[in-house]
Amino acid sequence: MEPEEERIRYSQRLRGTMRRRYEDDGISDDEIEGKRTFDLEEKLHTNKYNANFVTFMEGKDFNVEYIQRGGLRDPLIFKNSDGLGIKMPDPDFTVNDVKMCVGSRRMVDVMDVNTQKGIEMTMAQWTRYYETPEEEREKLYNVISLEFSHTRLENMVQRPSTVDFIDWVDNMWPRHLKESQTESTNAILEMQYPKVQKYCLMSVRGCYTDFHVDFGGTSVWYHIHQGGKVFWLIPPTAHNLELYENWLLSGKQGDIFLGDRVSDCQRIELKQGYTFVIPSGWIHAVYTPTDTLVFGGNFLHSFNIPMQLKIYNIEDRTRVPNKFRYPFYYEMCWYVLERYVYCITNRSHLTKEFQKESLSMDLELNGLESGNGDEEAVDREPRRLSSRRSVLTSPVANGVNLDYDGLGKTCRSLPSLKKTLAGDSSSDCSRGSHNGQVWDPQCAPRKDRQVHLTHFELEGLRCLVDKLESLPLHKKCVPTGIEDEDALIADVKILLEELANSDPKLALTGVPIVQWPKRDKLKFPTRPKVRVPTIPITKPHTMKPAPRLTPVRPAAASPIVSGARRRRVRCRKCKACVQGECGVCHYCRDMKKFGGPGRMKQSCVLRQCLAPRLPHSVTCSLCGEVDQNEETQDFEKKLMECCICNEIVHPGCLQMDGEGLLNEELPNCWECPKCYQEDSSEKAQKRKMEESDEEAVQAKVLRPLRSCDEPLTPPPHSPTSMLQLIHDPVSPRGMVTRSSPGAGPSDHHSASRDERFKRRQLLRLQATERTMVREKENNPSGKKELSEVEKAKIRGSYLTVTLQRPTKELHGTSIVPKLQAITASSANLRHSPRVLVQHCPARTPQRGDEEGLGGEEEEEEEEEEEDDSAEEGGAARLNGRGSWAQDGDESWMQREVWMSVFRYLSRRELCECMRVCKTWYKWCCDKRLWTKIDLSRCKAIVPQALSGIIKRQPVSLDLSWTNISKKQLTWLVNRLPGLKDLLLAGCSWSAVSALSTSSCPLLRTLDLRWAVGIKDPQIRDLLTPPADKPGQDNRSKLRNMTDFRLAGLDITDATLRLIIRHMPLLSRLDLSHCSHLTDQSSNLLTAVGSSTRYSLTELNMAGCNKLTDQTLIYLRRIANVTLIDLRGCKQITRKACEHFISDLSINSLYCLSDEKLIQKIS
């Protein structure tokens, strides 16, 4: 046999693959997990939730005085909007109009109703889904968090005017920060204030949101613009909140309807045009009976602060993600204290910059002291931005996302922050002085009225002070607008002491205490809008350092060329450009034509151009002409792009001496002479470092090729340490090898072995490529099959050998092979990491040159085997991280040897072996090793366990006494076509009903002992032909059953008739402890014409108390019985059993072992 043919067959043998097992990676964990098990329809129509918590009001009665009197504790419904002060779009306003106002590319958070998990869609995608007819919607999606402030929709929606008076965002948060907000989305990095005031909720029919409390204990206003809603409301009592928290932490939200666990719950239906106000802390669930469009918003206020703090603490304990929490919560609390102190005492604790921007304090002072004449001077005075503003005007706290160790010293060492002592407040009128301003209750008292706080506000402010004081330093989140938090706390305490005896009746003024001064009276000077640079803002309590700002580096001195002009395009000639998409890689899966969302906007991994060219429109930066090298080969007229300075010129247009460095992998690319000369010294130093690294790599790669007594690395000056493949056009193979000319008098055998080794490597590569080409041409199916190299590209790991020209000091025509690792992250081949492989001299023979030719040939054959094995070992080390063989290189013989070893290992030992390497992982997952899988009595069946079952394809699966759901079992049986034995003892009918479909495998054994909720109708559903695909098969899916276990079920003779009809092969039947079975049941099983009369071999009727001695007369008819268990049957006597045995012992011997256990003696 020719050596070449042998090598080809060897390469084909290396590519032997086994049949791929079925793995559905597209199934998400959410689809596997069991979800809602309670009946939502029953919750919608039952009269159980008939409590009365909601108050119906007229809009004119909802004012600040009402809130001051009651504290906004009860849910409110307004049947019409008269007197509320709300403004809504036209009645025909649709979701498509919402898209036009907020933008079709606006990303919205969409909730999958079935899994209660969130995904993202664009408004255009959501609109298409919303307008899809109901019967064509595959899933139920719900949008409940589209915040539309700072969009065109903002001015079309106005919330109740009373909410404007009490909302902390409008009255407590520095208004200049809110006015500086320009971002319309809720991106936290661009958020200047808690952006939660206006939401648009869009729900389709059937959407359900489980019980929840709005984030941060916020209250909610809610207007039904189109459609309707159904609410379940639970009051926020201490007991109910404890139940709610335990319910959240239990993870059983899909199994437990919280309204059934509390003593009082109200279901209320909201119709179109209703406005609903939900107070702080109320636990509620929402159902959408028809497609609905709702406008609403969240707000914090001062009349229920304890409840708001309590809900925020619950969110802390239940680990609610920061994305779903109230932004800047504790920063808002600090501003609340500051605003109360200022509005009651005229003393501000804001920094000077914040006073200017939000309070306009400088202008107010000048206006009061100087009159109109000074106002002109104020107008003439330029308003300058403090240098601190670029760092400190962000609402992020000093203590959040920074270095906490030096926090106290750093924040108080700023020169503009003055520490104010609160101890001598009674005698010093300048105690509240900041930035030159002096305010004191005695020096500048309020002139209009005596202030009285409601008991709701007093209690809330006390709780707020206690909470902020109890926070550790890294969680205080003091905003940068507060100059001295300690002085602020001291002032609030004094203020609360002074107002502790406020008259409750005088506090009902109908006017909020905290209001911003009006700017129109102060003649605020106009100025152009300036976007204030801010530091990056993250969630206030994430404990994660803020992302470091990338310093802006000065631009290079090279000419600025437009990025669009420099962007390269496809060559349309290489193999990658002319082939189609693979449909397998992550880019293809993202494409819309393959069913993906189409977000990446990237081409297939296999279609990434190997040699992208410059676009036709690019011109020379010196002469302005386009590429003149379309027909000629003149290098001087060819446009070249420098890979360093990105300058595009004709080489002939450069008027300078020196040489450039041509990039042979990328067309029209070089290092221009200017950049090449400047960087030559650095390149030389870098090249030395790379050579030293390459030597270390060579020692690892070629270690199997050396003997134990050889040094690990060849002498660095040895010419044979570099493999040179020299192109020879005369050679029939196109490539010949030669040793280095300076090798000297080395061993002849060593040199010849080197050449043979090099030749074998090259021929093996060429033969593999030719085989791939032939397989592609001879593909009879016409379908595109991926080569091994392409499959490896998609997998992300493969090793190929590419030929490159060496460095300048080597001969110009020599080519150096380099080992190239193709990874999925590489954009194309030129970016792949490269490792230079050097071949060292082979082991010096012990027998010298005088030995005969025969000995030399024998030695060559031995070396070929050694080289092949060493080569495989080296490749495995590079590619497998320690594994002995990889996908294409694994040996079938080696696999079978190891399989014979793995058969003796236990399940735990197999799992340990799977951790060794990828190959062992694949071998240990072989279904021959996992014919039986036992998960009985597992507390929870997780998605990972289900995926593991699918990989192993068991024949017998035990899920007894588990809480597996119907969806999980359906997912399993659809993907286990070879399943024969299924044990579901102790499971519920809701799960077992998954076997009533046409996808149920043909089982041999089914164990339903002591299953919950299974009676005659359920057995009928199991045994009758499935109705989900009529006309497909009119036979039962359990027709091959040989072992049926029904112990402990409430079944009657109707079930036995079904068994006789649909199970002709049944040999073992377990009917123990079925209390409804009688003697007539035994008569049915053994009647003339029944299949069980001849097929049954084992019958278990233990514990059936209604059986009598007459049963034994009927059981004599069973032809091939080997075991009858009648233990526990109180009405059957031992004497009758003995008589029964004597009748059966005519042809075979039977014995009575134990009490009433009849067995055949084999």
From Swiss-Prot:
Extract the SMART domains matched here. Answer: JmjC, LRR_CC, PHD
The protein's matches in InterPro entries, at most eight in alphabetical order, are given as: F-box_dom, JHD, JHDM1_Histone_Demethylase, JmjC_dom, Leu-rich_rpt_Cys-con_subtyp, LRR_dom_sf, Zinc_finger_PHD-type_CS, Znf_CXXC
Q: Where is this region: Disordered?
A: 367-389, 532-557, 704-789, 839-887
In this chain, where does the modification Phosphothreonine occur? T550, T632, T713
Using the record's annotations, give every residue carrying the modification Phosphoserine.
S28, S390, S394, S558, S692, S718, S731, S825, S832, S869, S883
Entry's cofactor comment: Binds 1 Fe(2+) ion per subunit.
Which reaction equation describes what this protein catalyses?
N(6),N(6)-dimethyl-L-lysyl(36)-[histone H3] + 2 2-oxoglutarate + 2 O2 = L-lysyl(36)-[histone H3] + 2 formaldehyde + 2 succinate + 2 CO2
Q: Where is the F-box domain?
A: 889-936
* Chain positions recorded as substrate binding sites: T209, K229
UniProt-reported outcome of changing C623A: No loss of its ability to repress the transcriptional activator activity of the CLOCK-BMAL1 heterodimer
LRR repeats: which residues?
961-982, 984-1010, 1048-1073, 1074-1103, 1104-1128, 1129-1156
Q: Outcome of mutating C571A, per the record?
A: Abolishes association with centromeric heterochromatin
General function of this protein: Histone demethylase that specifically demethylates 'Lys-36' of histone H3, thereby playing a central role in histone code. Preferentially demethylates dimethylated H3 'Lys-36' residue while it has weak or no activity for mono- and tri-methylated H3 'Lys-36'. May also recognize and bind to some phosphorylated proteins and promote their ubiquitination and degradation. Required to maintain the heterochromatic state. Associates with centromeres and represses transcription of small non-coding RNAs that are encoded by the clusters of satellite repeats at the centromere.
Family (UniProt): Belongs to the JHDM1 histone demethylase family.
Full protein name: Lysine-specific demethylase 2A
Species in which this protein is naturally found? Homo sapiens
Classification of source organism: Eukaryota, Metazoa, Chordata, Craniata, Vertebrata
